[in-house]
Every structure is written in C-alpha cells, then in structure tokens.
Design a protein with these regions (language model features):
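Charged, gly/pro-rich active-site loop segments
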Residues: 99, 108-121
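Helix-start/capping segments and mature chain N-termini
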Residues: 1-108, 129, 136-340
C-alpha cells in the first residue's frame, strides 16, 4: 500500500494511513489468538456481524509522545487497559488476557515511529477497538470477536489551535442514562451524539452539554468530554454514578489539581445553577486534554466567562498535565510508560 503524503505542519485531528496495525481474534474454541502486526488497511466484515447490526463494539483512545528527554512514551496505559476490560464486560465482549492491551499498544507504536510527529507538531494517537464480527440475526452477543489497534499522527484538536468554546446545554436530548452504558466506551454512546452536535454547530456553538436523564437539574458531560466547574477555589465535577464516562484525563485533572495546586476537589452532583455561576468551566478528554468554555447558553440565557485563559487555573492545570506527558517535569504519579 502506498501511503499518502502527510502535511506535518497542518495535521489537524484526522485519520491518516500508517504502516501497520495490531490484530487479535477470538473464537469460542481458542479464545484470544494474537495475529500480531499486519499492514494497515480495510477490515472485512459479514453484513450480519453484530457490530454492524447491533453496535456490539467498544474503543479506547490514548497517545504516544516524543518527549523532552528524547524518548517516546505513552500515558496511563494501565488505566486505558482497565477501562477496556470494563467496557468489554458491559458489551459482552470477552476481556483480553492481562497485559495484552499494553503490550499491543507499545508494539504498534514502535512499528509506526516514522509517523510520530515531533514535539511541536503533535502526537501519535492510538485507537484500540474490539467488536463482534460473527453473524447473528437475532439480538444476541457474537461468538467471534476482533481486537484491532491502529495509530495516526494528530495535531491540535482545534483547527485554529486551543480556543474557548461557545457551548449550549441541551434540554432536548440525553447522552445516556443511569444504569445504562454511559460508563463504557461503547460505540453507540457516540453515535447518539451526532445529531445533537450537528444541530448545535448549525446554530454556531462548539460543544453541547447533556443533562442527567434522571434529574435534569444536574449535568452529566459533553458529547465526548467530562466537565469541571471551578468556583472559589473549589473544583467540582459530576460523580461516576453510571452515566458518566470515567475519563482518564478527568482523573488526571483531579490528581493534578489537588497535588500541585492544593485545590479542593468535589465529585458529586453539579447543578445547572452551579454550572452557570462558575468562575471557570472546562472540558477534559484525550483529544484536547483540556478545553475552556467561553460561554454557556441554557434556555436562551447566555453567560460569558470573563477570566482570561492566560490568567486561568484551567490553563495552569492543562499545562501541568502536558508537562508530565512530555516529561518537562518529573511524573509524581507513575503515569509515564516509556517505549523500550
């Protein structure tokens, strides 16, 4: 396969063809069998596969970085692996053997180092996925599964660089429900946000905030990010009560805010009133790390945040996490996994 030329100075957050991907296959007779590295390319599926018909699939997202110590590292891989197990169990996908997730990620990153951007250009995004590939006409779990990891070089999540987001709270849609699959990185959770996001972008907004389906006085999260509200040096974020994704960047923010900045961190219900009266509001996720809210609209009322980003706690927390990821400072948490 001839790989298309990459514009390294204008990567954006897009999928690019790379050299190889990792594959393992599951059957009831042999459990998980490692196929290993294979050329990057299309995957063949039965039209009756459970992933196509019933959405039996999960994914993860992490990054590899070229650091100031002139080495390549991954960030919090064990946490991604643990969440992959949790998502697998919820979606009736046999969990991978212990250690395979981390080993496979490091192997595919190492084989695609030519696609790792330099420190100024970006990072290598890593996307592990698992899905039911066996044919099943009835609504049942597949007997056959595929585990794949592909990688792609990425730049800034935002085309014009980091910016404050104009956001809107949805009272029309819910992202998921308590006791459902909101805590899992199930593919259907994200498909359900496509229409709401399309509608709000047509209105000129950048991001959507979903309310809790059981209590619309409290917030859940954005379409692919957790939410934090800072007020009077107290940092609040919705608790992990079933409908919230246990974001790895979310957990990183909690630990960094407490360890480096002595902020009091509260995990619990966050009301609409608290959201609209915060000093700072920001979103967290692997893709953007942290993105600040510039404004929030709820029921045709818009509030704007007047704290300049360069003067904000949001910026300080974001830069501290990035410093750890790029080994500009010591990692006090044991999050960095070097490529050997």
């Amino acid at each position: 396969m001839k790989i298309k030329k990459i514009d390294w100075d204008n990567l954006g957050f897009n999928a690019h063809e790379t050299k190889s991907m990792f594959r393992a296959n599951y059957t009831p007779e042999s459990n998980w069998q490692v196929e290993g590295l294979i050329p990057y390319g299309d995957v063949s599926l039965s039209p009756a596969s459970t992933v196509l018909n019933y959405g039996q699939g999960i994914f993860e997202g992490t990054k590899a970085y070229q650091t100031s110590r002139e080495r390549v590292v991954c960030f919090r891989l064990e946490d991604n692996a643990n969440r992959f197990v949790s998502s697998s169990e919820r979606m009736c996908i046999p969990p991978l053997p212990k250690g395979l997730f981390e080993k496979a990620v490091l192997e595919v990153v190492k084989d695609n180092l030519e696609f790792l951007p330099n420190k100024k250009q970006g990072s290598l995004y890593v996307r592990p996925i698992a899905f039911g590939e066996g044919p099943m006409l009835g609504v049942k779990a597949s007997d056959y599964f595929t585990f794949l990891i592909y990688v792609t070089p990425v730049g800034s999540y935002f085309k014009s660089g980091l910016k404050s987001l104009n956001t809107i709270v949805s009272d029309k849609y819910h992202r998921t429900a308590t006791k459902s699959v909101g805590f899992a990185k199930a593919i259907g959770n994200y498909a359900g946000t496509l229409l709401p996001f399309k509608e709000i972008t047509e209105q000129g907004y950048d991001e959507i905030i979903f309310l809790n389906s059981s209590n619309e006085n409290i917030i859940d999260e954005a379409r692919s990010a957790n939410i934090f509200v800072l007020k009077d040096n107290i940092l609040k974020t919705p608790s992990l009560q079933g409908s919230i994704l246990p974001g790895i960047t979310r957990d990183s923010v909690i630990k960094v805010a407490s360890h480096f900045f002595n902020l009091e961190v509260y995990e619990g219900d966050v009301t609409i009133e608290e959201l609209m009266n915060g000093d700072e509001v920001f979103f967290t996720g692997t893709a953007a790390v942290i993105a600040p809210a510039g404004s929030i609209n709820y029921k045709n009322k818009t509030i704007e945040f007047h704290t300049k980003y360069n003067d904000s706690m949001t910026k300080q927390i974001r830069e501290k996490i990035i410093d750890i990821q790029h080994e500009n400072i010591e990692d006090p948490f044991g999050w960095i996994i070097p490529l050997k």
